[in-house]
């Protein structure tokens, strides 16, 4: 049986937040205060929709955005890790569950030639409209009270594993790699024998450190892709 690898995107695969990185397109690299202050807790995707509308009003086009986005740095050691996974697809299935959007993730993965590593990317659907403005929608509707309105990562993970099982694709273990507060919910889905890998010093790591009883799986903290790579090599040896 294969191991399922689940990755967050922002501050995990890449070493920044793709949504806030796009602000570099704006003259002065700063959004108007009114727009910045319009964010409501749990409604980040709606907020980003307003940001993208503003970018369109400023005459910022697809090619401008793409040029900025492909310059975003990968987390140290992450491209080596992804190439290793790509070379061992007989042992690993690999998915992304992210609060970013389809356009940004596709640009960034394709530029580094690592898009084929991932079997599936679950994120907010985005597209350029008829006048060239970027639009984004919520990924799905859910009833989780702890997750933002656009995406419950636990629900996505549960449904993916169930669908795979129905197609006779069962996993020996799940490894979840993430950093943020919204990665806690899916980590609670993990069972004994699975591995939760929170990024050191980030929100997920802090949540788990406060109460390890939240998680049934093994916990392995990481700082660079090299540490995750070492862990995966050990899995292959056993």
Swiss-Prot record:
GO terms for molecular function: metal ion binding; phosphatase activity. The active site is at 8 (nucleophile), 10 (proton donor). Keywords: Hydrolase, Magnesium, Metal-binding. InterPro entries: HAD-like_sf (IPR036412), HAD_hydro_PyrdxlP_Pase-like (IPR006384), HAD_sf (IPR023214), Pase_PHOSPHO-typ (IPR016965). It comes from Xenopus tropicalis (Western clawed frog). It holds the Pfam family Put_Phosphatase. Substrate binds at residues 19, 99. It is an enzyme of class 3 (hydrolase). Its EC number is 3.1.3.-. Its cofactor is Mg(2+). Mg(2+) binds at residues 8, 10, 179. Gene3D superfamilies: HAD superfamily/HAD-like. Probable phosphatase. NCBIfam families: DKMTPPase-SF, HAD-SF-IB. This is Probable phosphatase phospho2.
């Amino acid at each position: 049986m294969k191991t399922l690898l689940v990755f967050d995107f922002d501050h995990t695969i890449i070493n920044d937040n793709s949504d806030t990185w796009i602000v570099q397109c704006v003259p002065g690299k700063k959004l108007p205060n009114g727009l910045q202050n319009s964010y409501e807790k749990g409604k980040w995707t709606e907020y980003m929709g307003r940001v993208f509308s503003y970018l369109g009003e400023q005459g910022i086009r697809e090619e401008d955005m793409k040029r900025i986005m492909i310059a975003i740095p990968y987390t140290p050691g992450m491209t080596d890790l992804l190439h290793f996974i790509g070379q061992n697809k007989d042992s690993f299935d690999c998915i992304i569950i992210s609060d970013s959007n389809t356009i940004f993730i596709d640009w960034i993965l394709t530029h580094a030639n690592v898009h084929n590593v991932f079997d599936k990317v679950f994120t907010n659907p985005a597209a350029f409209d008829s006048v060239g403005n970027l639009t984004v929608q919520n990924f799905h509707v859910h009833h989780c009270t702890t997750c933002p309105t656009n995406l419950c990562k636990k629900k996505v993970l549960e449904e993916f594993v169930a669908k795979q099982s129905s197609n006779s694709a069962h996993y020996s273990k799940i490894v979840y790699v993430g950093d943020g507060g919204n990665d806690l919910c899916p980590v609670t889905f993990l069972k004994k024998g699975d591995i939760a890998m929170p990024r050191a010093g980030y929100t997920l790591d802090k949540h788990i450190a406060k109460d390890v009883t939240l998680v049934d799986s093994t916990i392995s903290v990481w700082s660079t892709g090299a540490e995750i790579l070492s862990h995966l090599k050990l899995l292959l040896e056993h």
